[in-house]
Amino acid sequence: MALITRKSFILVGVPPIMKSLIPIVLATLVILGMGCIGGGEEKMSLKVSSVFGNNEFIPAKYTCEGVDINPPLKIEGLSDNVKSLVIIVDDPDAPMGTFTHWIAWNIPPVTEIPEGIPKQGEVDKPIHIIQGRNDFGRIGYNGPCPPRGHGVHHYHFKVYALDTTLNLKPGASRKELEKAMEGHVIQYGELVGLYERK
């Protein structure tokens, strides 16, 4: 019977061959554990950029204080086996918890998302895109609009590269989108923009 003491972790009564396998088993468990916990960190291979830099302020044009259209996004590093893109834009600093500003899917693996995508369920021009309902209760993009005096909010423009297209109807919720995406994300990248209303 093997005995493991808390202080020394000395194994008593374990054959030498078994002892030699212990480091390998432990290393395997650590790697598997990192895979479960880390999730998509190893997939964060896309570079996402726009007219503002990472952790820089978003121009008012793309907010509720401006024209309120989506900013252009440039995507670099897409693999050849990507079948479609998903975009999720959210604000984790919202008073009631993470607030979703835009969800879109079945975007072809293009390197640029133009600004001003029409706010309707399915769009064919300037690119094909299907859009869902944001937390304003509207379809399409609605930009930053934090409460006045609430400080600087961080807006995460997340791009997911999938190995498939999704069988999801226009107007779907973020929860439905995320469920449909499960097991299909092969690359990921994000851009963080800032905004504040004083």
UniProtKB/Swiss-Prot annotation:
Family matches, as Gene3D superfamilies: PEBP-like (3.90.280.10)
Signal peptide (UniProt feature, chain positions): none
Classification via CDD domains: PEBP_bact_arch
Pfam families the record matches: PBP
Family assignment from sequence similarity: Belongs to the UPF0098 family.
Listed name of the protein: UPF0098 protein PH1269
